[in-house]
């Protein structure tokens, strides 16, 4: 909208999610591609990631304007003053807890824009999605399909919901006539096989990220902790039930299509990798 006819180059560890019909050049993060981009000229360069390598790349790239986080004088810095708020909230928990902006408002502001409800963009393989639509229609027998994303990655395991609660939820949903589809990546494979055995819920296995997105597109409701699945569900405009505990609840923008479920006892381990309680707060959801 702002710049009219644009040419986009995008580098990421997960190129499968970037919409191919809107981004002209999509690069997988590796040494060759980092070097390639570092030696190109751009009108605008944006980095919204505070990881050292990403900040160093923004410092190396030749661009008339730079937004976001950059590497300067041997440490993380901001490309413009607009990124200072997000940098400070990432360092000081007591300031982060007072933040009332959602993540999209924050990243739009970093880029000197106002967030006005713009929707996510994602790469959806419609052919794969149609194949899975037919398969899932056959095995769900007309029931409403609920995608249950049981894991949360390895970074913050404090977000995991207890196994016995997942089993209880699945059995209750099945009793109400829903079709439960267990979902996750390779880190959740063993756990999802356990749930399938305990409940007879359907588990299809693990897939490439592109195919995972295509399968998720054929659910009507998604239940998940805060994870990549949350972003996929929002991009696919699915109804979402989000388990939340360790982050600032104001960060999340669900576009009026979801609810956030939190522990009734609160959470003491803000952005924590371990819980000091005898019983994790996730037992209180």
Each model region followed by its residue ranges:
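Catalytic machinery of carbohydrate-active enzymes
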Residues: 1-285
